[in-house]
Swiss-Prot record:
Transmembrane segments: none annotated. InterPro entries: AAA+_ATPase (IPR003593), G_ENGA (IPR031166), GTP-bd (IPR006073), GTPase_Der (IPR016484), KH_dom-like (IPR032859), KH_dom-like_a/b (IPR015946), P-loop_NTPase (IPR027417), Small_GTP-bd (IPR005225). SMART domains: AAA. Belongs to the TRAFAC class TrmE-Era-EngA-EngB-Septin-like GTPase superfamily. EngA (Der) GTPase family. This is GTPase Der. Coiled coil: none annotated. Residues 354-439 form the KH-like domain. The lineage of its organism: Bacteria, Bacillati, Cyanobacteriota, Cyanophyceae, Synechococcales. GTP 2 binds at residues 184-191, 231-235, 296-299. Associates with the 50S ribosomal subunit. HAMAP family: GTPase_Der. One of its GO terms (molecular function) is ribosome binding.
Amino acid sequence: MPLPIVAILGRPNVGKSTLVNRLAGSREAIVHDEPGVTRDRTYQEAFWCDRDFTVVDTGGLVFDDDTEFLPLIREQAELALAEAALAVLVVDGQAGLTAADNEIADWLRHQNRPIVVAVNKCESPDKGAAQAAEFWSLGFGEPLPISSIHGSGTGELLDRVLELLPPADEAAGDETEIGVAIVGRPNVGKSSLLNSFLGEQRAIVSPIAGTTRDAIDTVIERNDQRYRLVDTAGIRRKRGVDYGPEFFGINRSFKAIRRADVCLLVIDVLDGVTDQDQKLAGRIEEDGRACVIVVNKWDAHEKDSSTIYEVERQLRDRLYFLDWAPMIFVSALTGQRVEKILDQVNTVVEQHRRRVGTSVINEVLGDAIAWRTPPTTRQGRQGRIYYGTQVTTQPPSFTLFVNDPKLFGESYRRYIERQFRESLGFSGTPIRLFWRGKKSRELERGANRATRV
């Protein structure tokens, strides 16, 4: 089951990115005292009281100005809220309640999501309650005074968030239907591939539009399995895109990636893997989606009996961070091998949803440690892995309980991930490893101890 999402919203310069970094225990979100630094939404994993979830950072909301990037920022916030289980509205306790805060609150009342108000910049515990009091008028219950910089009050905020999140064992969506996003640069043959699917399969639902801002889905059925296919906008380099319909179409494509079970990354074999293909592949991995690499226009490529192996080697050299994704060579124009794509989709989705028993995980860890012991510092402190367990699926995610996460460098973390893949498979899906210190439950409740490989 995918991790539940918590959207962090608010007007510019109230400290949203600082709060995200505090909740996720990282510094990935860019922080600057100039409004509008965050434009795209960014996702980070967080952990609190045995619950894993995702926090999404959004740009500052401004409703009365349509200049420059502001419409895009609003669109990003709407997309974040649409996929979130709840939202945290961040306000500035030093500035007090503003007209912009009220305008955002009016908008949130129509979004049908639980809302928690976090009154940031309450650095003084003595004054925090008084600073937060005036935000009762927003109508979202008790406002919580916090300091994102110092961490005070964030434990109470996280407690409130967990109260409102859906139960951990609650199913997310209809797992009998497989969502497939067809993504790639312009003119690589995405629409031709969709048409080829429709020519081969029986369409059982007319194209369904969600809102006017959503991509159009097409549902097909094959061997009693339903697939929801999304043909996304071609994704180009940012400097080649005007801030108009195409720009918003591309952002809807990114949303399609996040809500899909599996992405078909379509590559034009005549062009090879471009820089933009690499960035798109990175987005798929970052969002934790299963993936099949579809190499299109194979009919137009000159070849002999060994060509396919050489071409695959060249493509994989450029897509090394998707080395876990299967690759298939097709021609959407002629239909060559298109029918085999859905077989690959079934396989990778099964791996994406797969669970592994704790005993098996710890057997893999034991073998890995026997082959290569954890590193030791110059002061003689050695890393110790006590045990591991799977915490979620889609993508498969594991928590490793260790004496101190800081003792495990990137090299050893990558080694453990390789051992997981060699022993457990997981073809077609990324995996996540979280490293948690044994004393994490005793530490100050302001920072996340789980770190992603």
